[in-house]
């Protein structure tokens, strides 16, 4: 499909601008704001009839505002006769609410949001490192889940690692850690065994694996309060780890994240720009950001030209 147009909400303006620059296009002209009562107000200020439209919007904090911006923009574009609408969601919020645990009386909010997107008229979704890949099955439209972790891996190769070992911060992240370990010449793995007695709190129980005098690479899909990673780093250092690096795609950094990172034993935290960092986080000396703009721009180009997305990750 030709006549590609890019639009952006207010969640990741710098990333959206960078993607547009990589594709040699200008961001579409749209007014995205609020009425005096807080309701989302959107107006598309250019012709989009028949166009292949991409909306770049993370559903990060403020989550509900950014979510509503996205769906209201989709509705405005649909009513303006856009040919195809792809939601580019670098960070997909509500992804952690993807199941009912032991039949507890809770919603599966990831499914609710997926249904919301389908019903409003989104034709396709492009996202990065979903918290659980099976969330793709919640959608009634095609979903491309690209791997920001490969950008992180490329950065790992630039660090002078001494006797590295890849560490999963919990049992659930073993598959992700194993994939990174395989890319790093089948290096060894360790696992942090933790318990989570309640939300946003975890307790490290054991370190499974030998980390003495080794550079430890903690890998995760996101950092929220940072409590898990900081506890993991402390446990690794107590067991003689030489250095501890933490790599994660999505920098949520909520709650006590700043305090946790300031007081942590992590030598460096490396994240991607799927969520904008607050000024105080940006000023932390042990936090560094990598951009996904080139990868997302290439994925958008391939979708628009009906080319394979999986081919991006076959080498």
From Swiss-Prot:
| Underlying gene | prs
Write the protein's name.
Answer: Ribose-phosphate pyrophosphokinase
The entry marks the following residues as binding D-ribose 5-phosphate, namely 196, 220, 224-228
Give the pathway: Metabolic intermediate biosynthesis; 5-phospho-alpha-D-ribose 1-diphosphate biosynthesis; 5-phospho-alpha-D-ribose 1-diphosphate from D-ribose 5-phosphate (route I): step 1/1
Which residues constitute the signal peptide according to the record? none
Which CDD domains does this chain map to?
A: PRTases_typeI
Alphabetical list of SUPFAM superfamilies matching this protein: PRTase-like
Q: Which cofactor does it need?
A: Mg(2+)
């Amino acid at each position: 499909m030709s006549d590609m147009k890019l639009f952006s909400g207010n969640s990741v303006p710098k990333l959206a601008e960078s993607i547009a620059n990589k594709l040699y296009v200008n961001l579409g002209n749209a007014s995205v704001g609020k009425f005096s009562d807080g309701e989302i107000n959107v107006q598309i200020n250019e012709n989009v009839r028949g166009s292949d439209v991409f909306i770049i919007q993370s559903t990060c904090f403020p989550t509900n505002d950014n979510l509503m911006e996205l769906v209201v923009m989709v509705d405005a574009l649909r009513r303006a006769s856009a040919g195809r609408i792809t939601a580019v969601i670098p960070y997909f919020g509500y992804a952690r609410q993807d199941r009912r645990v032991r039949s507890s009386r809770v919603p599966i909010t990831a499914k609710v949001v997926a249904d919301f997107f389908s019903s409003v008229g989104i034709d396709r979704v492009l996202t990065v490192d979903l918290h659980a890949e099976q969330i793709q099955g919640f959608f009634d439209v095609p979903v491309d889940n690209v791997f920001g972790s490969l950008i992180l891996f490329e950065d790992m190769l630039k660090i002078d690692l001494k006797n590295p070992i890849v560490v999963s911060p919990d049992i659930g992240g073993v598959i992700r850690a194993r994939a990174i370990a395989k890319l790093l010449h089948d290096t060894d793995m360790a696992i942090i065994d933790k318990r989570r007695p309640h939300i946003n709190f975890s307790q490290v129980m054991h370190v499974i694996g030998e980390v003495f005098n080794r550079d430890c690479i903690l890998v995760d899909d996101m950092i929220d309060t940072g409590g898990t990673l900081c506890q993991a780093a402390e446990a690794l250092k107590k067991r003689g780890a030489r250095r501890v690096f933490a790599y994660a795609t999505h920098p949520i950094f909520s709650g006590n994240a700043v305090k946790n990172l300031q007081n942590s034993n992590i030598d460096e935290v490396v994240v991607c720009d799927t969520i904008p960092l607050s000024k105080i986080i940006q000023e932390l000396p042990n936090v560094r950001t990598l951009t996904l703009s080139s990868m997302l721009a290439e994925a958008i180009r391939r979708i628009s030209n009906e080319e394979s997305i999986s081919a991006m990750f076959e080498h």
